[in-house]
Amino acid sequence: MSKIIQAFHSSNKNYTPIWFMRQAGRYLPEYQVLKRTTNSFFELCYNPIKAAEATLQPIARFDFDAAIIFSDILVLPDSLGINIRFINNLCPTAEKIPNLLDLQKSKIQNTKISKVYEAIDIVRKKLNKKKSLIGFCGGPWTVLTYILGYNSRNTPKFHEIKSNNKHELIVDSINILTKHTIDHLANQILAGADIVQIFDSWAGILPYQEFSEYVIKPTSNIVKTLKEKFPHIKIIGFPKGAGKLYHKYTKETNVDGISCDYDLQLDEMLKLQKNVLVQGNLNPNTILSKNSKIIEESVIKIMDTLSNNRFIFNLGHGILPETPIKNVELIVKLVKNYHSSE
C-alpha cells in the first residue's frame, strides 16, 4: 500500500505524503527538452512513451509520493472531435464552439484517448509500487465551460444560460459529459491508476443553485458509479473557488478526499478534515519567492495545522512554469523532515 493510500485510511503522525498538481510540466528543464521533440502539447499527451516519460520526470527529481499522469482535462473534448486550441499558450478554447445538440451526439474517438491509458500502463510498470499513480479528469461543468466559453461569470455567455432558456440544454450536455467522464476515469483505473482526481476548476463561478446542479450532482454520479465498479479506488474532488460550498460538496458527493485551493482558510480545512482527507493548499505564487523563509513559514504553518490527521501536502492549484527548482526541493525536504524534527 502506498503512503498516500495509507493517508486515506488513517492519520500517520510520522509521515505526510506529498505531490504537486501539474508536477509534470513546464517548470522542469528536462520537460522542456522532451517538449521540443513534439509539435504540440496534445501530440505529447497522445504519445504514450513520451507522456510516460514526462510523468516520471518529477518522481526521479523530487521523489514525490505519487505520479500524476501527464495529460490534460481537455483530452476528453478533443477526443469527442471538438478541436481545442491554446491561445497564447494560456487560454484553452474550442476552435469552433459546437451546438449543444451536436455535442450530445458526439462519440469518443478511442484511437486518440486510448493513448492516455497506454501511458498509464507504461508508468505503472515503471513506478515503484510504494508510490501511487493518479489519473484525472475535468469536472463535466468545467469541461463544458472550455467548450462553450463560460469561463467567467461576467461574460454575457454565462448569463445566457438562463436568459436564453439554455438551462435544460446545459444539464443535458453535462449529463452526456458525465457519462464520458465515468468511462474515461474507469479506463484510467483499469490501466493502473489507484487514485483519481476530479478537477472542477470553474466550480467557483457558479451561484449556489447552479453549483448544486452543475457540479455536485454530476460529481456524485461519477463517485457512485466508480465506487460500484472499483470500491478500492480513492477519489479526490477539487471544486476550486467553492469557498463555503466545499463543505456541501464534500458531504454530498462522497469523495474520499478534498483538494483545497489556496483561498480556503486553514480553519475551514480543519473542519473538513473531521470527515474526509484534505489535500492542499500552498499558494503556487508563494513558491516563486526568493526568500526561503517565506516559503518555510508557509509550509510549516500548513503542516502544524493539518498534518496530525488525514492529510496530503499539495498546492492550492497547479505549479507555475517559472517556479525555481530549488524551491520545490526545499518544500519536499521540509515536508518529509517535518515529523522527525517535532
From Swiss-Prot:
Transmembrane intervals: none
GO cellular component: cytosol
Enzyme class: lyase
Enzyme Commission number: 4.1.1.37
InterPro entries, per the entry: UROD/MetE-like_sf (IPR038071), Uroporphyrinogen_deCO2ase_HemE (IPR006361), Uroporphyrinogen_deCOase (IPR000257)
Biological processes annotated in GO: protoporphyrinogen IX biosynthetic process
Disulfide cross-links: none
Positions of substrate binding: 22-26, 41, 72, 146, 201, 317
Function: Catalyzes the decarboxylation of four acetate groups of uroporphyrinogen-III to yield coproporphyrinogen-III.
Family: Belongs to the uroporphyrinogen decarboxylase family.
Name of this protein: Uroporphyrinogen decarboxylase
Organism, as annotated: Orientia tsutsugamushi (strain Boryong) (Rickettsia tsutsugamushi)
